C-alpha cells in the first residue's frame, strides 16, 4: 500500500490514490509501504508522471547510504520498527527527493511515521518543500528517541532502588533480564543517533539546502550532539547496575556456601570419627550409641547455625 499527501496552506493532507493521479502536481509526499502486485500499476503510473524509476533507485541504494545526483537526493537511514515478535529493531527507510517531492520506501511498523501521519495538523511546513518535510520526519524521530532515553532512565532509577535495597533481593533473573533489554535498547538508540547524524551531515555538506532548512538541520545536529553523551551515561549506568547485581548474586552464593559449611562440617567430623578403625571404641558397644551419634550430629549442625544467625553473621 501507499499513502499520498498533498500540500495545502502549508499543511499536509492525505489524498485518495485515484484522486492524486489526476492532480499529481500538488503532491509533496508519497509514502510507499510494502507495495504488492495489485498496486504496481498505480505505482508505475505515478513513477511515469514523476519521471522517477524506482527499480533504478533500488539498485543505487543497495550500494550507497547517501547519494546526490542530477536526478535527486537519495538517503537510507535507520528508524525504529516493530518486527514479527513485536520487538523494536533498527530498520532501513529509503528517502528520495526528486522534483520537490519526497518518496519514502519502507515496511510497515515504523512508529515515527505513524506518529507523524496521525498528527498532520501539528506539522506546518512554512516553506512547503520536500527538504522541510524530510527534516520534520527526522525531528520527530529524534523526539521519539529522546522519549525512549527518558523512559530508560526512569526504569533504571526504579531498578536502582530495588537493587540497592538493604533487604535481601529476590528475582535476580528478572532484574538481569530487564537490564539486558535496557542495554540492548540503549545500544540501538546509540546506533540510530549516529546514523541520523551521518544523514544530516550529508544533507548539510553535500546537498544545496535552502537557508532555512540548513539552519533546521544544524539545529537537529546540535540536539543529537547533546543526546549522545546522555545516552552514553545511560549505557554506563546499565553496565554498573548489571555488575552490581552480579556482585550481589556472588555474595548470596557465598552465603549459601557458608551455611552449608557451617551446618555440615561438624556432623561430618563426628561421623568420620566413628569411621576410624580403632580396637577400643566403647560407644560402639552401647545400645543407645547409634541414636546418640545421630542426635550429636544434629546438635552440632544446628547449634553453630543458630549462633551465627544470632550474631547476624549469616
Swiss-Prot record:
It catalyses: Mg(2+)(in) = Mg(2+)(out). One of its GO terms (molecular function) is nickel cation transmembrane transporter activity. The keyword Nucleus does not apply. Keywords: Cell inner membrane, Cell membrane, Ion transport, Magnesium, Membrane, Transmembrane, Transmembrane helix, Transport. It is found in: Cell inner membrane. InterPro entries: CorA_cytoplasmic_dom, CorA_MIT, CorA_TM1_TM2, Mg/Co-transport_prot_CorA, MgTranspt_CorA/ZnTranspt_ZntB. It is a multi-pass membrane protein. The record marks 254 as: Essential for ion permeation. It comes from the Bacteria. A motif (Probable selectivity filter) lies at residues 275-277. GO terms for cellular component: plasma membrane. The keyword Iron does not apply. The chain crosses the membrane at residues 256-276, 288-308. Mediates influx of magnesium ions. Alternates between open and closed states. Activated by low cytoplasmic Mg(2+) levels. Inactive when cytoplasmic Mg(2+) levels are high. Belongs to the CorA metal ion transporter (MIT) (TC 1.A.35) family. Homopentamer. In the absence of Mg(2+), interactions between subunits are weakened, and dimers, trimers and tetramers can be observed in vitro. NCBIfam families: corA. The central ion permeation pathway is formed by the first transmembrane domain from each of the five subunits. Mg(2+) binding strengthens interactions between subunits and leads to the formation of a symmetrical homopentamer surrounding a closed ion permeation pathway. Low Mg(2+) concentrations trigger both a conformation change within each subunit and a loosening of the interactions between subunits. This results in an open ion conduction pathway. In addition, this results in a less symmetrical shape of the whole complex. This is Magnesium transport protein CorA. The lineage of its organism: Bacteria, Pseudomonadati, Pseudomonadota, Gammaproteobacteria, Enterobacterales.
